[in-house]
From Swiss-Prot:
GO terms for molecular function: arginine-tRNA ligase activity; ATP binding. NCBIfam families: argS. GO terms for biological process: arginyl-tRNA aminoacylation. Keywords: Aminoacyl-tRNA synthetase, ATP-binding, Cytoplasm, Ligase, Nucleotide-binding, Protein biosynthesis. Belongs to the class-I aminoacyl-tRNA synthetase family. GO terms for cellular component: cytoplasm. This is Arginine--tRNA ligase. Monomer.
Length: 577
């Protein structure tokens, strides 16, 4: 149920009858304050200006044509021409019943789209580090949300699995006589990478051999391809352990590495030349873009092939967008890549559009994000100043959560404690990130993220168990409530019900904008409203059975909404804490 969409349609119809143009925007929003009702229509200002009349006068005319019978109990004009809408308690009660009768809590499925989501993108022969966390978990929240809404989502893990470094690594593996790279652990590979780079920089004969190996690898030599595959397999096996720990939905089947697009690159360069978009410049092949200027104010040159014949990331990204439209049949493509890559992506996509590889009707969206910072406001590092491995971060999260849970539950059995610590620790790391607006940098702070108060995973997980405890105390089977009516008489009942019925609206925003913090804020709001409702509207000691059962049903919808909402974020819930 999308009440905002329903009201928008009703207000829009009334505005048109009142003389507004057919494409008028009613600007129906959820009200920020309870005294302004549940929703507010703010579109009178802009439309009245076009019509040459006072906004309040237009609002009065709209009200005479606005039919909200059975939806709103009160509609009033506020200030210069805002229309405040107060939902009818009977309407709320009816839709709470409908939400409870549906596994999807009444959430409709929009027109199905094929959506490709590019996220995570670690590099081969390197262990995942904290820099991969944001893309991985924000991207996965988008995947879960869009899949829940019924879209066909294709996960694209754009792994860095190609380039000159592989000649260097294979040469070093050979030098060390590692006959079976498949048995090496990734930690060894990290060391190998450092050693290989050192030799590459210091030993010219080794560097020459590495360069020759790259040529053989790119030429498809079976021996070198086999060595390359081993490096990829070791890396992705290790990364899958991290994905499983993080409770993200990526698997080996989702790997679409840079190497996938290699066969397309010569054809793309040739086609861009044939279209007159790419030209030779100082031996390289370049696309000059009027949309981007260099320091001299001239069109910026984007190199797509170096003078030695090598290709660049831009060339791969052009091929990648083309493949996602032509082969994967994407209706929409989302990229969860940090904000520093924005201009690079925009330039690649400008070329893609000019070349006609992806039509304008298919959005290419850069859902960029900021950096994860330490308490000092600088990029998050180890005490020694090195990069923090993601596995080490998750180990620390688990250890801290284990201590926290044991402190609060000294008698809890070890296996139960471990399960709870995992849900709390991993949930805390993910939620701390997801609850922040992705476009900004955020401070990583263990104390804040593991707190049991505020907008944190432990608080949200506890809020869920608190609602469940009501049913344990009531000693009632939830299914026994199915025939009981919902009756809304108190303000706090109405406020909780109205917010619960905004679940679909919240999902719609997250799906459109790729902003999981909106879902976090919504769920935190629900938890707070339930707390006030629980305190002021007795459930188990209600004045009669009808009120008791009705309030139990509000509690039931609260629990289901919290669980489903947290699931779209990839945050695990527990039944006891």
């Amino acid at each position: 149920m999308n009440i905002q969409a329903l009201l928008s349609e009703k207000v829009s119809q009334a505005m048109i009858v009142a003389g507004a143009p057919a494409n008028c925007e009613p600007q129906v929003r959820q009200s920020a304050k309870v005294q302004f009702g549940d929703y507010q229509a703010n579109g009178m200002m802009a439309v009245a200006k076009k019509l040459g009349m006072a906004p309040r006068q237009l609002a009065e005319q709209v009200l005479t044509h606005l039919d909200l019978n059975g939806i709103a109990s009160k509609v009033e004009i506020a200030g210069p021409g805002f229309i405040n809408i107060f939902l009818d308690p009977a309407f709320l009660a009816e839709h709470v019943q409908q939400a409870l009768a549906s596994e999807r809590l009444g959430v409709a499925k929009p027109a199905k789209q094929t959506v490709v989501i590019d996220y995570s993108a670690p590099n081969v022969a390197k262990e995942m580090h904290v820099g991969h966390l944001r893309s991985t978990i924000i991207g996965d929240a988008a995947v879960r949300t869009l899949e829940f809404l019924g879209h066909h989502v294709i996960r694209a893990n754009h792994v860095g699995d190609w380039g000159t470094q592989f000649g260097m690594l294979i040469a070093w593996l050979e030098k060390q006589q590692q006959e079976n790279a498949g048995e090496m652990a990734l930690a060894d590979l990290e060391g190998f990478y450092r050693d290989a780079k050192k030799h590459y920089d210091e030993d010219e004969a080794f560097a020459e051999r590495a360069r020759n190996y790259v040529v053989k690898l790119q030429g498809g030599d079976p021996y070198f391809l086999d060595m390359w595959r081993k490096l990829v397999d070791i890396t992705m096996t290790q990364n899958q352990i991290t994905y499983n720990r993080l409770n993200v939905t990526l698997t080996r089947d989702d790997v679409m590495g840079e190497s996938l697009y290699n066969p397309m690159l010569p054809g793309i360069v040739a086609d861009l030349k044939a279209q007159g978009l790419a030209v030779e410049s100082e031996g390289a092949t370049v696309v000059f873009l009027d949309e981007y200027k260099n320091k001299e104010g001239e069109p910026m040159g984007v190199i797509i092939q170096k003078k030695d014949g090598g290709y660049l990331y831009t060339t791969t990204d052009i091929a990648c967008a083309k493949y996602r439209y032509e082969t994967l049949h994407a209706d929409r493509v989302l990229y969860y890549i940090d904000s520093r890559q924005h201009q690079h992506l925009m330039q690649a996509w400008t070329i893609v559009r000019k070349a006609g590889y992806v039509p304008d009707s298919v959005p290419l969206e850069h859902h960029m994000f900021g950096m994860m910072l330490g308490k000092d406001g600088k990029p998050f590092k180890t005490r020694a100043g090195g990069t923090v491995k993601l596995a080490d971060l998750l180990d620390e999260a688990l250890e801290r959560a284990r201590r926290l849970v044991a402190e609060k539950n000294p008698d809890m059995p070890a296996d139960e404690l471990e399960k709870l610590a995992n849900a709390v620790g991993i949930g805390a790391v993910k939620y701390a990130d997801l609850s922040k607006n992705r476009t900004t940098d955020y401070i990583f702070d263990w104390d804040n993220m593991l707190a049991f108060e505020g907008n944190t995973a432990p608080y949200m997980q506890y809020a869920y168990t608190r609602v469940l405890s009501v049913f344990r105390k009531a000693e009632i089977d939830e299914s026994a409530l199915s025939s009981a009516p919902v009756v809304i008489r108190e303000d706090r009942e109405a406020q909780l019900a109205a917010r619960l019925l905004q679940f679909e609206e919240t999902l719609t925003v997250v799906a459109r904008e790729g902003t999981p913090h909106v879902m976090c804020a919504y769920l935190y709001d629900i938890a707070g409203l339930f707390s006030g409702f629980y305190e002021h509207c007795p459930i188990l000691s209600a004045e009669n059975e009808e009120v008791r059962n009705s309030r139990l049903k509000l509690a039931q919808l609260t629990a289901k909404t919290l669980k489903l909402g947290l699931d779209t974020l990839g945050i695990e819930t527990v039944e006891r804490m």
